[in-house]
Amino acid sequence: MSLLVKICGLTTPETLGAALDAGAEMVGFVFFPPSPRHVGLTAARELGQQAKGRALKVALTVDADDATFENIVETLRPDLLQLHGRESVARIRDLKQRFGLPVMKAIAVATTADLVPLAGYADVCDRILFDARAPKDATRPGGLGATFDWHVLDALALDRPFMVSGGLSADNVAEAVRITRAGGVDVSSGVERAPGVKDCDMIRNFIRAARAAEELSVQ
């Protein structure tokens, strides 16, 4: 199976265009005001139109309420909901029934103990994203440039597709893929020159490095 590449936290037509032209399969838009990558609904509508038919549109939320989801779904028309908060299994099941969209749940990882809730989420989610656990004093759950010990996933037995994120860059994505055997990689801060400011060349370099890692993994 081909390695999926997701560029998350896109906010401008230029950087979205770079991701699409370089072949990203997924493009992520953040709907969380504390994040420097937050996009408003008007911008999301325009970016969604630009991405339509070229990549899967992913809406990232953090413990959002029903009204927020309704606005996002109506405006962006996402292909996938990415839940990055403390959403329960019951909440995820309700969202899937309500909107009829697949869900990717982010699991914050530091040690193998963080994998304990995975079984419940795997039953209801279409895809799992393993991300580095944020520090206790962090104001947002991801996009902080921190990695986690990828060997935590060594004994992983999961019947759902999964991706990895957290501190990925063009320099380490090959190692992440080699160790985790993930089906996809998700990057945000690793393709930025400042928080929330994506760099087109860094996006291209990351995708190029991910493709090289994919080729090595099938040899």
Curated annotation (Swiss-Prot):
Report the enzyme's class at the first EC level.
Answer: isomerase
For this protein, the Enzyme Commission number is 5.3.1.24
Record key words, sorted: Amino-acid biosynthesis, Aromatic amino acid biosynthesis, Isomerase, Tryptophan biosynthesis
Q: Name one GO biological process term.
A: L-tryptophan biosynthetic process
SUPFAM superfamilies linked: Ribulose-phoshate binding barrel (SSF51366)
Cite the CDD domains for this sequence.
PRAI
The reactions it catalyses are: N-(5-phospho-beta-D-ribosyl)anthranilate = 1-(2-carboxyphenylamino)-1-deoxy-D-ribulose 5-phosphate
Q: Which Pfam families does the record associate with it?
A: PRAI (PF00697)
Q: Which Gene3D superfamilies match?
A: Aldolase class I
Give the pathway listed in the UniProt entry for this protein. Answer: Amino-acid biosynthesis; L-tryptophan biosynthesis; L-tryptophan from chorismate: step 3/5
GO-annotated molecular function: phosphoribosylanthranilate isomerase activity
| Family membership | Belongs to the TrpF family.
Q: Which HAMAP family match?
A: PRAI (MF_00135)
Stated name of the protein = N-(5'-phosphoribosyl)anthranilate isomerase
Q: Which organism is it from?
A: Bradyrhizobium sp. (strain BTAi1 / ATCC BAA-1182)
Q: What is the lineage of its organism?
A: Bacteria, Pseudomonadati, Pseudomonadota, Alphaproteobacteria, Hyphomicrobiales
